[in-house]
Protein backbone atom coordinates (compact mmCIF):
# COMPACT_ATOMS: atom_id res chain seq x y z
CA UNK A 1 0.00 0.00 0.00
CA UNK A 2 1.03 3.56 -0.58
CA UNK A 3 1.98 5.52 2.52
CA UNK A 4 -0.03 8.50 1.27
CA UNK A 5 -3.81 8.20 1.19
CA UNK A 6 -5.97 10.50 -0.92
CA UNK A 7 -8.69 12.41 0.95
CA UNK A 8 -12.15 10.86 0.57
CA UNK A 9 -13.59 14.30 -0.02
CA UNK A 10 -11.70 14.60 -3.32
CA UNK A 11 -13.51 11.60 -4.81
CA UNK A 12 -16.86 11.54 -6.55
CA UNK A 13 -17.69 8.08 -5.26
CA UNK A 14 -17.50 9.28 -1.65
CA UNK A 15 -19.84 12.18 -2.45
CA UNK A 16 -22.29 9.73 -4.02
CA UNK A 17 -22.06 7.37 -1.06
CA UNK A 18 -22.93 10.30 1.16
CA UNK A 19 -26.12 10.96 -0.82
CA UNK A 20 -27.51 7.51 -0.05
CA UNK A 21 -29.78 8.33 2.93
CA UNK A 22 -31.44 11.12 0.96
CA UNK A 23 -31.71 8.96 -2.17
CA UNK A 24 -33.24 6.11 -0.19
CA UNK A 25 -35.87 8.31 1.40
CA UNK A 26 -36.74 9.92 -1.92
CA UNK A 27 -36.97 6.62 -3.82
CA UNK A 28 -39.18 4.96 -1.23
CA UNK A 29 -41.60 7.89 -1.06
CA UNK A 30 -41.83 8.47 -4.81
CA UNK A 31 -42.41 4.82 -5.72
CA UNK A 32 -44.96 3.94 -3.04
CA UNK A 33 -48.02 4.20 -5.38
CA UNK A 34 -46.58 1.73 -7.90
CA UNK A 35 -45.29 -0.55 -5.13
CA UNK A 36 -48.83 -0.65 -3.71
CA UNK A 37 -50.22 -1.67 -7.11
CA UNK A 38 -47.59 -4.33 -7.61
CA UNK A 39 -48.46 -5.91 -4.27
CA UNK A 40 -52.02 -6.47 -5.53
CA UNK A 41 -50.99 -8.36 -8.68
CA UNK A 42 -50.70 -11.81 -7.04
CA UNK A 43 -48.37 -13.23 -9.73
CA UNK A 44 -47.77 -16.95 -10.00
CA UNK A 45 -44.05 -16.32 -10.11
CA UNK A 46 -41.63 -13.39 -9.93
CA UNK A 47 -38.54 -13.37 -12.13
CA UNK A 48 -35.76 -10.79 -11.93
CA UNK A 49 -33.23 -9.81 -14.59
CA UNK A 50 -29.95 -7.99 -13.99
CA UNK A 51 -26.18 -7.93 -14.45
CA UNK A 52 -23.37 -6.78 -12.17
CA UNK A 53 -24.56 -4.63 -9.27
CA UNK A 54 -28.10 -4.80 -10.63
CA UNK A 55 -27.78 -8.59 -10.63
CA UNK A 56 -26.76 -8.54 -6.97
CA UNK A 57 -29.72 -6.29 -6.16
CA UNK A 58 -31.92 -8.77 -8.05
CA UNK A 59 -30.59 -11.68 -5.99
CA UNK A 60 -31.24 -9.73 -2.78
CA UNK A 61 -34.74 -8.95 -4.03
CA UNK A 62 -35.44 -12.57 -4.89
CA UNK A 63 -34.40 -13.65 -1.38
CA UNK A 64 -36.53 -11.13 0.49
CA UNK A 65 -39.56 -11.29 -1.82
CA UNK A 66 -39.83 -15.07 -1.71
CA UNK A 67 -39.26 -15.23 2.05
CA UNK A 68 -41.76 -12.50 2.91
CA UNK A 69 -44.45 -12.89 0.23
CA UNK A 70 -44.25 -16.63 -0.31
CA UNK A 71 -44.23 -16.23 -4.09
CA UNK A 72 -41.73 -18.33 -6.06
CA UNK A 73 -39.00 -15.92 -7.05
CA UNK A 74 -35.73 -16.31 -8.93
CA UNK A 75 -33.12 -14.48 -10.98
CA UNK A 76 -32.90 -15.35 -14.67
CA UNK A 77 -29.27 -16.28 -15.39
CA UNK A 78 -26.98 -14.41 -17.72
CA UNK A 79 -29.72 -12.87 -17.80
CA UNK A 80 -31.78 -15.26 -19.99
CA UNK A 81 -29.26 -17.79 -21.22
CA UNK A 82 -30.63 -19.92 -23.99
CA UNK A 83 -34.31 -19.79 -23.02
CA UNK A 84 -35.66 -16.74 -24.84
CA UNK A 85 -39.39 -16.12 -24.44
CA UNK A 86 -39.90 -19.63 -23.05
CA UNK A 87 -38.47 -18.43 -19.74
CA UNK A 88 -41.49 -16.16 -19.15
CA UNK A 89 -45.23 -16.67 -18.97
CA UNK A 90 -48.52 -14.81 -18.62
CA UNK A 91 -48.66 -15.31 -14.86
CA UNK A 92 -45.19 -13.84 -14.27
CA UNK A 93 -44.16 -10.54 -12.82
CA UNK A 94 -40.76 -9.74 -14.31
CA UNK A 95 -38.57 -7.09 -12.68
CA UNK A 96 -35.85 -5.89 -15.05
CA UNK A 97 -32.97 -4.08 -13.32
CA UNK A 98 -30.50 -1.77 -15.04
CA UNK A 99 -29.24 1.40 -13.44
CA UNK A 100 -28.82 3.10 -16.81
CA UNK A 101 -31.84 1.44 -18.39
CA UNK A 102 -29.63 0.79 -21.39
CA UNK A 103 -27.86 -2.52 -20.67
CA UNK A 104 -28.44 -4.31 -24.00
CA UNK A 105 -28.87 -7.84 -22.62
CA UNK A 106 -31.34 -6.74 -19.93
CA UNK A 107 -33.30 -4.63 -22.41
CA UNK A 108 -33.51 -7.56 -24.85
CA UNK A 109 -34.65 -9.95 -22.13
CA UNK A 110 -37.31 -7.51 -20.90
CA UNK A 111 -38.71 -7.17 -24.41
CA UNK A 112 -38.90 -10.94 -24.76
CA UNK A 113 -40.74 -11.15 -21.45
CA UNK A 114 -43.28 -8.57 -22.66
CA UNK A 115 -43.76 -10.57 -25.86
CA UNK A 116 -44.39 -13.72 -23.79
CA UNK A 117 -47.22 -12.02 -21.90
CA UNK A 118 -45.46 -11.32 -18.60
CA UNK A 119 -46.09 -8.14 -16.66
CA UNK A 120 -42.74 -6.35 -16.84
CA UNK A 121 -41.58 -3.58 -14.51
CA UNK A 122 -38.29 -1.76 -15.00
CA UNK A 123 -36.15 -0.73 -12.05
CA UNK A 124 -33.79 1.95 -13.30
CA UNK A 125 -32.31 5.33 -12.49
CA UNK A 126 -33.49 6.80 -15.82
CA UNK A 127 -37.29 6.93 -16.22
CA UNK A 128 -36.81 8.00 -19.86
CA UNK A 129 -34.56 5.06 -20.72
CA UNK A 130 -35.33 2.41 -23.36
CA UNK A 131 -35.88 -0.16 -20.60
CA UNK A 132 -38.50 1.99 -18.87
CA UNK A 133 -40.21 2.63 -22.21
CA UNK A 134 -40.34 -1.11 -22.97
CA UNK A 135 -41.95 -2.08 -19.65
CA UNK A 136 -45.51 -1.87 -18.36
CA UNK A 137 -44.32 0.25 -15.44
CA UNK A 138 -41.13 1.66 -14.00
CA UNK A 139 -39.70 2.00 -10.51
CA UNK A 140 -37.19 4.84 -10.42
CA UNK A 141 -34.13 5.02 -8.18
CA UNK A 142 -34.45 8.83 -7.97
CA UNK A 143 -30.69 8.89 -7.36
CA UNK A 144 -29.78 11.75 -9.66
CA UNK A 145 -26.78 11.41 -11.93
CA UNK A 146 -24.25 8.83 -10.80
CA UNK A 147 -20.89 9.96 -12.21
CA UNK A 148 -18.49 7.51 -10.58
CA UNK A 149 -18.30 4.21 -12.45
CA UNK A 150 -18.84 1.98 -9.35
CA UNK A 151 -22.55 1.91 -8.53
CA UNK A 152 -23.32 2.86 -4.95
CA UNK A 153 -26.46 4.95 -4.54
CA UNK A 154 -28.24 3.33 -7.49
CA UNK A 155 -27.53 -0.16 -6.16
CA UNK A 156 -28.83 0.77 -2.72
CA UNK A 157 -32.00 2.30 -4.18
CA UNK A 158 -32.69 -0.82 -6.25
CA UNK A 159 -32.20 -3.14 -3.29
CA UNK A 160 -34.29 -0.94 -0.98
CA UNK A 161 -37.17 -0.76 -3.45
CA UNK A 162 -37.22 -4.54 -3.73
CA UNK A 163 -37.28 -4.82 0.06
CA UNK A 164 -40.12 -2.28 0.12
CA UNK A 165 -42.03 -4.42 -2.40
CA UNK A 166 -41.60 -7.44 -0.14
CA UNK A 167 -42.03 -5.93 3.30
CA UNK A 168 -43.39 -2.42 2.91
CA UNK A 169 -41.78 1.00 2.77
CA UNK A 170 -41.71 1.24 6.55
CA UNK A 171 -39.38 -1.74 6.86
CA UNK A 172 -37.01 -0.52 4.15
CA UNK A 173 -36.90 2.96 5.67
CA UNK A 174 -35.57 1.52 8.94
CA UNK A 175 -32.16 1.36 7.24
CA UNK A 176 -31.98 5.17 6.88
CA UNK A 177 -30.67 6.12 10.32
CA UNK A 178 -28.02 3.33 10.58
CA UNK A 179 -26.80 4.13 7.05
CA UNK A 180 -26.42 7.80 7.93
CA UNK A 181 -24.55 6.80 11.09
CA UNK A 182 -22.25 4.49 9.13
CA UNK A 183 -21.36 7.30 6.74
CA UNK A 184 -20.66 9.61 9.65
CA UNK A 185 -18.51 7.02 11.44
CA UNK A 186 -16.57 6.04 8.28
CA UNK A 187 -15.50 2.58 9.43
CA UNK A 188 -11.94 1.71 8.47
CA UNK A 189 -12.23 -2.09 8.70
CA UNK A 190 -9.63 -3.19 11.22
CA UNK A 191 -7.19 -1.42 13.55
CA UNK A 192 -3.94 -0.53 11.87
CA UNK A 193 -5.25 0.15 8.41
CA UNK A 194 -7.86 -0.71 5.77
CA UNK A 195 -8.91 -4.31 5.39
CA UNK A 196 -7.78 -6.39 2.41
CA UNK A 197 -10.18 -9.33 2.81
CA UNK A 198 -9.43 -12.80 1.56
CA UNK A 199 -13.14 -13.37 0.98
CA UNK A 200 -16.46 -11.65 1.67
CA UNK A 201 -19.20 -13.85 3.12
CA UNK A 202 -22.81 -13.15 3.97
CA UNK A 203 -25.71 -14.98 5.54
CA UNK A 204 -29.32 -15.13 4.38
CA UNK A 205 -30.31 -11.96 2.53
CA UNK A 206 -26.81 -10.58 3.14
CA UNK A 207 -25.31 -13.28 0.87
CA UNK A 208 -25.97 -11.29 -2.33
CA UNK A 209 -24.79 -8.21 -0.44
CA UNK A 210 -21.49 -10.04 0.11
CA UNK A 211 -21.21 -10.54 -3.65
CA UNK A 212 -21.88 -6.83 -4.20
CA UNK A 213 -19.30 -5.78 -1.61
CA UNK A 214 -16.75 -8.10 -3.23
CA UNK A 215 -17.51 -6.38 -6.54
CA UNK A 216 -16.91 -2.99 -4.89
CA UNK A 217 -13.51 -4.17 -3.65
CA UNK A 218 -12.68 -5.18 -7.23
CA UNK A 219 -14.04 -2.03 -8.90
CA UNK A 220 -13.04 0.60 -6.37
CA UNK A 221 -9.86 -0.87 -4.86
CA UNK A 222 -8.65 -3.18 -7.62
CA UNK A 223 -8.71 -6.07 -5.13
CA UNK A 224 -10.23 -9.21 -6.66
CA UNK A 225 -12.01 -11.18 -3.95
CA UNK A 226 -14.75 -13.80 -3.86
CA UNK A 227 -18.13 -12.90 -2.37
CA UNK A 228 -20.21 -15.93 -1.36
CA UNK A 229 -22.85 -17.25 0.97
CA UNK A 230 -21.32 -18.28 4.29
CA UNK A 231 -22.64 -21.82 3.95
CA UNK A 232 -21.19 -22.15 0.45
CA UNK A 233 -17.82 -20.90 1.72
CA UNK A 234 -17.59 -23.99 3.91
CA UNK A 235 -17.94 -26.22 0.85
CA UNK A 236 -14.60 -25.27 -0.72
CA UNK A 237 -13.91 -21.53 -0.98
CA UNK A 238 -12.72 -21.36 2.65
CA UNK A 239 -9.56 -23.15 1.47
CA UNK A 240 -8.63 -20.35 -0.95
CA UNK A 241 -6.58 -17.28 -0.11
CA UNK A 242 -4.99 -16.26 3.15
CA UNK A 243 -6.56 -12.95 4.19
CA UNK A 244 -9.24 -12.54 6.84
CA UNK A 245 -12.86 -13.16 5.93
CA UNK A 246 -15.10 -10.10 5.90
CA UNK A 247 -18.39 -11.36 7.35
CA UNK A 248 -21.62 -9.48 6.65
CA UNK A 249 -24.30 -10.69 9.02
CA UNK A 250 -26.87 -8.89 11.11
CA UNK A 251 -27.62 -11.82 13.39
CA UNK A 252 -25.68 -14.73 14.96
CA UNK A 253 -25.02 -17.40 12.37
CA UNK A 254 -23.82 -20.96 12.82
CA UNK A 255 -21.99 -20.97 9.48
CA UNK A 256 -19.93 -17.95 10.51
CA UNK A 257 -19.06 -19.75 13.76
CA UNK A 258 -17.89 -22.72 11.71
CA UNK A 259 -15.81 -20.46 9.45
CA UNK A 260 -14.10 -18.96 12.51
CA UNK A 261 -12.67 -22.40 13.25
CA UNK A 262 -10.70 -22.17 9.98
CA UNK A 263 -10.04 -18.49 9.26
CA UNK A 264 -9.80 -15.11 10.93
CA UNK A 265 -13.16 -13.36 10.58
CA UNK A 266 -13.81 -9.61 10.68
CA UNK A 267 -17.46 -8.76 11.30
CA UNK A 268 -18.34 -5.04 11.19
CA UNK A 269 -20.68 -3.79 13.89
CA UNK A 270 -23.97 -2.23 12.87
CA UNK A 271 -24.30 1.45 13.81
CA UNK A 272 -27.07 2.28 16.28
CA UNK A 273 -27.38 -1.48 16.92
CA UNK A 274 -28.93 -1.84 13.48
CA UNK A 275 -32.41 -1.25 12.16
CA UNK A 276 -34.27 -3.98 14.02
CA UNK A 277 -34.87 -5.88 10.78
CA UNK A 278 -32.31 -8.30 9.34
CA UNK A 279 -33.10 -7.50 5.71
CA UNK A 280 -32.91 -3.75 6.29
CA UNK A 281 -29.64 -4.36 8.13
CA UNK A 282 -28.31 -6.02 4.96
CA UNK A 283 -28.65 -2.63 3.24
CA UNK A 284 -26.63 -1.04 6.03
CA UNK A 285 -23.94 -3.69 5.60
CA UNK A 286 -23.79 -2.89 1.88
CA UNK A 287 -22.89 0.72 2.68
CA UNK A 288 -20.30 -0.33 5.26
CA UNK A 289 -18.73 -2.57 2.61
CA UNK A 290 -18.65 0.29 0.10
CA UNK A 291 -16.79 2.48 2.57
CA UNK A 292 -14.30 -0.27 3.41
CA UNK A 293 -13.54 -0.76 -0.29
CA UNK A 294 -13.02 3.00 -0.68
CA UNK A 295 -10.68 3.07 2.33
CA UNK A 296 -8.52 0.38 0.72
CA UNK A 297 -8.49 2.16 -2.65
CA UNK A 298 -7.39 5.46 -1.16
CA UNK A 299 -4.68 3.83 0.94
CA UNK A 300 -3.34 2.30 -2.29
CA UNK A 301 -3.42 5.65 -4.11
CA UNK A 302 -6.00 4.34 -6.59
CA UNK A 303 -8.57 6.54 -8.34
CA UNK A 304 -11.88 5.02 -7.19
CA UNK A 305 -14.05 7.03 -9.57
CA UNK A 306 -12.72 5.68 -12.88
CA UNK A 307 -11.55 2.05 -12.59
CA UNK A 308 -9.57 0.80 -15.59
CA UNK A 309 -11.40 -1.21 -18.27
CA UNK A 310 -14.86 -0.24 -16.97
CA UNK A 311 -17.54 2.19 -18.13
CA UNK A 312 -20.86 3.29 -16.70
CA UNK A 313 -22.90 1.34 -19.27
CA UNK A 314 -21.55 -2.17 -19.84
CA UNK A 315 -22.17 -3.95 -23.13
CA UNK A 316 -22.59 -7.71 -22.70
CA UNK A 317 -24.34 -10.49 -24.56
Language model regions located:
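Cofactor-/ligand-binding subdomain signature composed of acidic, glycine-rich
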Residues: 1-44, 149-150, 156-175
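Glycine-rich phosphate-binding loops that contact phosphosugars or nucleotide phosphates
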Residues: 41-186, 203, 238-278, 283, ...
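Short helix-capping/linker segments at secondary-structure and domain boundaries
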Residues: 69-70, 166-174, 291-306
Amino acid sequence: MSAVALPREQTRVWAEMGEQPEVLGRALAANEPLLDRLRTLAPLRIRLIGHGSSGHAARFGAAVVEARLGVPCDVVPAPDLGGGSALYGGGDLVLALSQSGRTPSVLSAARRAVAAGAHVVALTNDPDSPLAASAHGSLSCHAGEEVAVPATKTFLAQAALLLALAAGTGVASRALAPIAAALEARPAGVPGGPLRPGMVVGSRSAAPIAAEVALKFAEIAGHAVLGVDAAEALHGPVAAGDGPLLALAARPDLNLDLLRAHRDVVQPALPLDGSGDADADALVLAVIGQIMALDLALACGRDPDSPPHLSKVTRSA
